[in-house]
Amino acid sequence: MVIDWGNGRIQKIEDPSSMTGGVVYRYGNKGSYEVKIWAEELQLIDISGLLLPLSNLYLGNMPRMKSLALNSISDTRKLDLNTFCPNVESINIGRLADLERLEIGNCSRLRSIQIYSNPKLTSIEFGSHPETESLYCSYNGLSSLSLKNLPALRNIDLSSNERLSRLELNEETSISAILIQGCAFQSITDILKCCSSLRELSCSYNKLTELDLSGCSNISELRCEHNQLTRLMVPQGSLLEHLYCHSNQLDEDALNTLFDSLGQVVNPAIYYPTSLRQYRISFNDNPGADDCNRSILNDKNWIVENK
C-alpha cells in the first residue's frame, strides 16, 4: 500500500495488517491536503475520525475489498462505491454529517449494509443485492425506501428515520425482524402481508391506528407502544415473550379481545422454581386499562408490567 499524504510525503507500507491501531499520520501545519491511496490488495478499509473533514473522498479500484467502514466524516456530500469496490461484502457508513448521495447499486455481493446517522441522506437506491441478509439504516433523513431488490433480507432496522412513512418489500419474504420505531408510518398493513415469517416487530412511536398481526403466526416480540392504536390483533394462541402496547387508544373491548387471543402459559413444575420463559405484557395508559378484565391474563399466567 502506498499513501501520498499531499504534503510531499509518500509512505509505503508493505503489510498494512501489521500496523497495530491502523495507519496514523499527523500534519505539522493546519490546512487542506489531497490524500491518495493505492492499495489494490486491501480487503478492509476503516476511515474514522472526529468529524474528519474530507471534501473529495475518492477511492480507486479495489477489487479485493471485502469490508469498508467510513465514520465521523464531514464535508463529503457524495459517495460512489459502485466502481472502486464491486466485490465488497460489508459496508459501515455512519455519521457523515453532510452526505446527500450514496451510490451502491453495483455492489452486488453485499451481505451486510449499515448506513446510519447521516441526517442529510434523504434517499437510497439499491441495485440488485441478492445476498444481503441484514440492513441497518437508522437515523437518516429517509421518507420512503424500496427493498424489492434485496430478496434474502432477514433483519431490517430503519428506526428513527423521523420522516419515513413508506416501505416497499417483495410479496414473499423471509424477514424475521423489522425495527421501525420512531418513524412516521400511519399504516403497515402492506408490509405485514409480505412478512409471514416475522418473529420480531418494533413499531413504537409512529402514527398507527390499527395493527393486525393475525397472519404472522411466528411473532414472539411486539413493541407497538406510543401509537394511536384503537385495535390490535395477534394470532390466536400467541405466546409473545414481550407484548408492549401501552400508551395507545385501546378501549376495554379491544383489550379484552387481545387478552382472549393470547396463549396459555404453562405453570412450571413444582420442583422447578420458575418457568424457562416468561411472557410479559404492558397495556397501561390506554382508555380501557382500568376497566378491562385482567383476570384473563392472571388465569393464563401472563406477567403484567407497567411502563
Could you tell me what each predicted segment is?
Residues 2-4:
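Beta-strand signatures of extracellular beta-sandwich domains
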Residues 9-78, 82-89, 195:
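LRR N-terminal entry segment and analogous cap-like coil->beta motifs
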Residues 59-61, 79-85, 104-107, 125-130, ...:
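A structural signal for leucine-rich repeat
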Residues 140, 161, 183, 206, ...:
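Consensus "Asn ladder" position of solenoid repeat domains
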